[in-house]
Curated annotation (Swiss-Prot):
Sequence similarity: Belongs to the ISN1 family.
Subunit structure: Homotetramer.
Matching SUPFAM superfamilies: HAD-like (SSF56784)
Domain of life where this protein originates: Eukaryota
EC code: 3.1.3.99
Function: IMP-specific 5'-nucleotidase involved in IMP (inositol monophosphate) degradation.
Entry keywords, A to Z: ATP-binding, Hydrolase, Magnesium, Metal-binding, Nucleotide metabolism, Nucleotide-binding
Gene label: isn1
Residues the entry annotates as binding Mg(2+): D153, D155, D409
Catalyzed reactions per annotation: IMP + H2O = inosine + phosphate
Name this protein carries in UniProt: IMP-specific 5'-nucleotidase 1
Cofactor(s) annotated in UniProt: Mg(2+)
Amino acid sequence: MTTRYRVEYALKSHRRDQLIEWIKGLLAVPFVLHSQPTAVQEEDATKLAAVAHDTHQRYAEIFSDVERLLNDHIDHELSGAAGKSKLKLLVPTVGTFFTRLYLREAFDYQDRQRFISRRRFVAPSFNDVRLILNSAQLLGLVHTKGLELVTFDGDVTLYDDGANLNADSPVIPRIIRLLQQGIKVGIVTAAGYTDEAKYYERLQGLLDVMRDASDLTDEQRSALIVMGGESNYLFRYDASSPHRLTYVPRENWVIGEMATWEEEDITQLLNIAESSLRACVANLNLPVSVLRKDRAVGVFPKNRGRLSREQLEETVLVVQNTVERSQVGSRLPFCAFNGCSPFFVSHYLRHHPPRRKYKPPIQPCMLISITQPGGNDVFVDIGDKSWGVRACQQYFGGIDPSRTLHVGDQFLSAGANDFKARLASTTAWIASPAETVQLLDELDTIQKVLA
C-alpha cells in the first residue's frame, strides 16, 4: 500500500511555496498575451518600449490587486476570522502576516532592477516574485512600526555553505551599520556548539571587527547575540572574553513552555531518533558518522563526502515517522520538518497556530526539528528557529514580531529550517550571502528615503 509519505515525496508539493506559485501564475497571463517574441529588436524598438510599458502596467495592476487581498487577509486575522479571507480560499496554505506588504511599490522597484517587464522570452519567475516579496516586506517594516531586531541564518546567508565569516566579508559593514542604528542583531544557526570557541571560529571576522570598531559603543556591541542549535544555546557579545562571546544561562532567556520540557523526555526522544538514524545508516549503507549532542543527534558524511538528496530525504522521512509514532512523540507535540509539506506544516500548526503576539499554551509541549542545516547531513534538534527567534525577542525585552526580520535561505527545500521563523517574525528569503548584502543595502535606502 502506498504510504502518505511516499506520495508526498513523489508529488514534491512540499517543494513549492504556494503563494509565490500563485502570484507567478497570475503574472503569466499578461506575459503570454502581450509579449512580442517575434519582434526584431532593432526594427521595433519603439513598439517594444510601448509593449514593455503596457506590460508593466498590467503586472502592477496584478500586484495592486494581490496587495488588497493581503490587506483583507490581515484584517480578517485581526478580527479573529483568519480562515475566512478570500486569499485563504485562493491559497489555503497562506500564513500570518505581521505587517502590511507594499507589493505595488516593491514591484516598481524590482522592475527597475531586473527589467521584468522588458523580457520577451522569460516570464516572471519564482525568483522575481521572491525578491518582490522581500522588498514589500522591507517597505512594510519601515512604513509601519519600524525595525528593532534582525536575525540571520548562518550558512548561505552570512557566509558560503561550510565556510566562515571572514573579516573581508561585505556583509560585516552592513551588520555594523544595523548596530549603529540601534537595531539588535541575532545569528540563529543550526550549529549546536556548547562552547564559545566553535562560534568564534565561525564568526571571527565579525567579532574581531566589532571589537576594533571605534564607531561602535559598548551598548551597541552588546546588541549582538548568537543562538545555537536552532534554539538551545545563547551567547552574547563580550569584548573581555578571549572568544568575544559569553554563554547566557538558559534561565535568562528561555520562554514559556520551553521551561516545561523535561530532560527525561528529551533524552527519550533523542534515543528514539538516534536508533532510527542508525537503522537508516544500516539499511541504506550510508557512509556517515552518527553524532549525539546534548540536545541533538544526527548523521554527517565521513571524509567530507556527499550524500544524494534521495538518501537525505529518505533518512529525514523515516526518522520523522518513527519519532511521531513513538509513545513520547504522541504524548508531546513535535515538529519533524522536511521542507514545506502540507502534513508537516499542519501538524505543527495544530499545536502552535501562528499568533501576532506569542502566548504559550497551557499544556506543556516539546518540538523537534529534523533538518539538513548544511545541505549534506541530517540532524534532529530539540526546538526550531521559531523558538530561536522568539528567544532572541525575549532576551531583548520582548520585541514584537512586527518589528523583527529573519533573513535566511532555507524556506523551501528539504530540511528548510528557516521556514519555522515565519511563525515568530517577518522574513526575507535570500539565496546567497550576496543577496543578503543587497537586501541590507535596500533596507538602508528605504530607511533614508522614508526618514
